[in-house]
A protein has these predicted regions:
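Acidic, low-complexity proline/glycine/alanine-rich linker and hinge segments
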Residues: 1-28, 66-74
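A short, well-structured alpha-helical segment
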Residues: 13-14, 30-36, 40-86
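Short, low-complexity, Pro/Ser/Thr/Gly-rich segments in the mature regions of secreted, periplasmic
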Residues: 90-98
Length: 98
């Protein structure tokens, strides 16, 4: 990426499961704000679908949504054999210009 800012994760929720590997989104534009991404995760801890720009998002610039989506898709979660087959959670990324 390029630009003076950085993308930082501020939080996530998926029941009581932890994110094992949570890549940071790349910063590719002069935009800042919060992007909330809804994630659907299988019992093995794989993110199987993502929707960027859900409730909690403060900036819907395409460059932020796209990067948040990529980071969310690559997030690996704790496996949980007792979890629902498809568990829905949320990750919130905060993009800020330095």
């Amino acid at each position: 990426g390029y630009g003076p800012g950085n993308g930082g994760g501020t939080g996530y929720s998926l029941g009581n499961r932890k994110a094992l590997n949570k890549p940071q989104p790349e910063y590719t534009c002069q935009e800042q704000g919060r992007v909330a991404v809804q994630v659907t995760v299988d019992r093995n801890g794989n993110t199987i679908s993502v929707t960027a720009g859900v409730q909690g998002t403060t900036n819907t610039a395409k460059c932020l949504l796209d990067q948040a989506k990529i980071a969310a898709q690559n997030t690996k979660w704790q496996a949980d054999s007792n979890a629902p087959e498809k568990q829905v959670g949320k990750i919130i990324y905060t993009f800020s210009l330095n």
